[in-house]
């Protein structure tokens, strides 16, 4: 292409310059001829000199014309071709790079596609304390919060039981993804599976599709949606670490559930939100976090059984609450420290005592609760209550059931041992 441009430009310049050079040569020869005629016939020496002069002039004219006709077109052609090639290269390079990056972005943005398809069905749940009011707005303050997702267009919402129950003197509010807020009523509760449903009076809501947890594989990509720390519409992603994590391994002796373990971040406020696969289907309900990279969700297959039983109860008009009776209220969410969990905690933190063999980890404290007023903090480890050793969460429930007014609790906060006193509330 470049060679063709050079040849074409050379031919063009030759055609343009040849007539001018020819006229110059003709004029020069006519001048020389006139001068020789005016002198007449001179001597032989004068003629020889004149002839020698004409030969030299013709030689000089022929050399200059040949050099000009060859060098100028070639130089100009090469220069123009080089400029055109460089400009053409500059124009092509960014275009190729932009197309390549755009294609890769669309190819690997699968998580964004999942969120766009199902994010509108996720809701933010607030628990309002009706005894305490904000000084400026006059509205009840938020005692705790959680997440949920719409499973029926007529306002049925699924969440965790611990998000909405065992909280006396409170009311439940639900905020949709479009910003609208509605009061909610608790329809069904099963504390055994830690599941509950809420109802708001609105219709035409976007619904979350329910998938199958039985087909999950370890290493499969999942996305956790919810409102951690009251930050609505938060998205985290990870993989399934284990599909059959037995409740006994987590110290939950009253439950017969094989939890989904994931490294997707599930923090305070994510509880009750959906854990979805790359098809945008809920395959679990976010339940609890032990530490960074270790979180658990209730498999959706257990959720379907709960929903079927709840629908049957509603048809029969029976009581909507099932499971264990409501206990005295302390205001914490806890997890038994099994050997596996202890090993993980000790490997991730240098502040864990080496001689710690058992206890209960406090991983959430509800603001305004007796535990919060007594000084408990997330991350504390309960080792004794009323001078009795605590080995699992059942021991804590037993201490609450004893009916004593105050609980004398021994905790580990880092490497320090501390004593706190809590007065639980009656239901």
Curated annotation (Swiss-Prot):
Q: Which CDD domains match?
A: cpPDZ_HtrA-like (cd06785)
Q: How does it sit in the membrane?
A: Single-pass membrane protein
What does the record give as the reaction this protein catalyses? Cleavage of non-polar aliphatic amino-acids at the P1 position, with a preference for Val, Ile and Met. At the P2 and P3 positions, Arg is selected most strongly with a secondary preference for other hydrophilic residues
Q: Which GO terms describe its biological process?
A: apoptotic process; positive regulation of apoptotic process; proteolysis
PROSITE patterns xref list: PDZ
- Which positions are catalytic residues? 162, 194, 271
Extract the ranges annotated as region (Disordered): 33-55
Instruction: Report TM segments.
Output: 66-86
Chain positions covered by the region annotation Serine protease: 144-307
Gene Ontology annotations for the cellular component aspect, listed alphabetically? mitochondrial intermembrane space; mitochondrial membrane
| InterPro entries reported for this sequence | PDZ (IPR001478), PDZ_6 (IPR041489), PDZ_sf (IPR036034), Peptidase_S1_PA (IPR009003), Peptidase_S1C (IPR001940)
Residue ranges constituting the PDZ domain according to the UniProt record: 330-415
Q: Which GO terms describe its molecular function?
A: serine-type endopeptidase activity
Keywords attached to this entry: Apoptosis, Hydrolase, Membrane, Mitochondrion, Protease, Serine protease, Transit peptide, Transmembrane, Transmembrane helix, Zymogen
The broad enzyme category this protein falls into is hydrolase
Question: What is the annotated localization of this protein?
Answer: Mitochondrion intermembrane space; Mitochondrion membrane
- Oligomeric state and partners? Interacts with th/DIAP1 (via BIR 2 domain).
Family, as annotated? Belongs to the peptidase S1C family.
Function description: Serine protease that shows proteolytic activity against a non-specific substrate beta-casein. Promotes or induces cell death either by direct binding to and inhibition of BIRC proteins (also called inhibitor of apoptosis proteins, IAPs), leading to an increase in caspase activity, or by a BIRC inhibition-independent, caspase-independent and serine protease activity-dependent mechanism. Can antagonize antiapoptotic activity of th/Diap1 by directly inducing the degradation of th/Diap1.
Q: What name goes with this protein?
A: Serine protease HTRA2, mitochondrial
Q: Which organism is it from?
A: Drosophila pseudoobscura pseudoobscura
């Amino acid at each position: 292409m470049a060679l063709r441009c050079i040849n074409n430009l050379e031919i063009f310049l030759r055609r343009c310059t040849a007539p001018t050079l020819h006229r110059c040569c003709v004029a020069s020869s006519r001048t020389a001829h006139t001068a020789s005629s005016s002198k007449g016939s001179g001597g032989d020496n004068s003629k020889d000199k004149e002839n020698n002069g004409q030969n030299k002039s013709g030689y000089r004219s022929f050399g200059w014309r040949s050099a000009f006709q060859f060098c100028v077109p070639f130089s100009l052609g090469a220069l123009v071709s080089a400029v055109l090639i460089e400009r053409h290269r500059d124009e092509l390079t960014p275009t190729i790079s932009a197309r390549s990056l755009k294609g890769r972005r669309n190819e690997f943005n699968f998580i964004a596609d999942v969120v766009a398809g199902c994010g509108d069905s996720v809701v933010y749940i607030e628990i309002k304390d009706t005894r305490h009011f904000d000084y400026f707005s006059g509205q009840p303050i938020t005692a705790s919060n959680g997440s949920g997702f719409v499973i029926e267009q007529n306002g049925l919402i699924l969440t965790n039981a611990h998000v909405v129950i065992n909280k006396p003197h409170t009311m439940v509010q639900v905020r949709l993804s479009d910003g609208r807020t509605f009061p909610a009523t608790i329809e069904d509760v099963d504390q055994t599976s830690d599941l509950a449903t809420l109802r708001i009076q609105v219709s035409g809501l976007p619904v979350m599709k329910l998938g199958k947890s039985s087909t999950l594989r370890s290493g499969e990509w999942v996305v956790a949606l919810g409102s951690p720390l009251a930050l609505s519409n938060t998205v985290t992603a990870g993989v399934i670490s284990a599909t059959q994590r037995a409740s006994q391994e987590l110290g939950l002796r009253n439950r017969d559930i094989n939890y989904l373990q994931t490294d997707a971040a599930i923090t305070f406020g994510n509880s009750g939100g959906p854990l979805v696969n790359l098809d945008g289907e809920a395959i679990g309900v976010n339940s609890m976090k032990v530490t960074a990279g270790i979180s658990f969700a209730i498999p959706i297959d257990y959720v379907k059984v709960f929903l079927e039983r709840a629908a049957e109860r509603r048809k029969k008009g029976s009581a909507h609450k099932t499971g264990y009776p409501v206990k005295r209220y302390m205001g914490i969410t806890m997890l038994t420290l099994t050997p596996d969990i202890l090993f993980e905690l000790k490997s991730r933190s240098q502040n864990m005592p080496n001689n710690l063999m058992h206890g209960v980890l406090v991983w959430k404290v509800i603001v305004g609760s007796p535990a919060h007023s007594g000084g408990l903090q997330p991350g504390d480890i309960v080792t004794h209550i009323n001078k009795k050793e605590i080995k699992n969460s059942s021991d804590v429930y037993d201490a609450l059931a004893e009916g004593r007014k105050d609980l004398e609790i021994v905790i580990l906060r880092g490497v320090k041992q501390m004593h706190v006193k809590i007065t639980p509330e009656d239901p």
